[in-house]
């Protein structure tokens, strides 16, 4: 595991410990279970694809560790509304504070501004974060295989499903894919960015595709920057995309979404 990822995970452990002191897991769970407003995340992607369109998970993030601030003029609600207007299937909202300048409030504001299902994009290592995701309104959570043991993956997925959420499981190589395929979720995210070198190549998705059985929905993540990238993926029957940076750098993220998948 590289230094930046190890540092992020160490910070996450501290954050969870602090959050638990401020609010018990039992109290948070009651709030999460009381919410009856889950929006179907995986279904929204399938609905778009069944219409012959790309299933785009449009991301809302102000910054990243590798690129710094991506968007100075940052209004999560405005961005969410623009994405919804221009054909996004779902939203992905960064909730990490220290490394991505995200927040729980960004997710709440984005979700309130539209009717799209929302992924909590964060580095999840503890059940408390799954419960917190539903309590803040998330409809789906991200589990990154590189950061979790197989037993953790299973337990966190089960908790998310029990709370009514979908799960996007993220992989970077064949070994991680094996672990992901042992889970129940149909959503397999292939991150084209190597978490160790931070280099990006779409070949990562193309290389792993033959190993993925029918019944799973591949979501290609990172490095989707231009219409040709989308066309290449769709030619290989990859119909779902998680895109952030290309949209965040545009004047109007939703307009850029429409241009990318036109």
UniProtKB/Swiss-Prot annotation:
Note the Gene3D superfamilies from the entry.
Aldolase class I
Lineage, top-rank taxon, reads Bacteria
Keywords from the named record: Amino-acid biosynthesis, Aromatic amino acid biosynthesis, Decarboxylase, Lyase, Tryptophan biosynthesis
**HAMAP family named in the record:** IGPS_B (MF_00134_B)
**Could you say which EC number(s) this protein's record lists?**
4.1.1.48
**Pathway this chain belongs to:** Amino-acid biosynthesis; L-tryptophan biosynthesis; L-tryptophan from chorismate: step 4/5
Asked whether the UniProt record includes Amino-acid biosynthesis among its keywords, one would answer: yes
Gene symbol of the encoding locus: trpC
Q: What class of enzyme is it?
A: lyase
- What is the name listed in the Swiss-Prot or TrEMBL entry for this protein? Indole-3-glycerol phosphate synthase
What the record says about family reads: Belongs to the TrpC family.
Which CDD domains does the UniProt entry name for this protein?
Answer: IGPS
Which NCBIfam families does this UniProt record tie to the protein?
A: PRK00278.1-2, PRK00278.1-6, PRK00278.2-4
The record's section on InterPro entries has: Aldolase_TIM, Indole-3-glycerol_P_synth, Indole-3-glycerol_P_synth_dom, Indole-3-GlycerolPSynthase_CS, RibuloseP-bd_barrel
Keyword Amino-acid biosynthesis assigned to the entry: answer is yes
Q: Which GO terms describe its biological process?
A: L-tryptophan biosynthetic process
Question: Which sequence ranges are marked TM in the entry?
Answer: none
GO MF entries: indole-3-glycerol-phosphate synthase activity; phosphoribosylanthranilate isomerase activity
What's its catalytic activity? 1-(2-carboxyphenylamino)-1-deoxy-D-ribulose 5-phosphate + H(+) = (1S,2R)-1-C-(indol-3-yl)glycerol 3-phosphate + CO2 + H2O
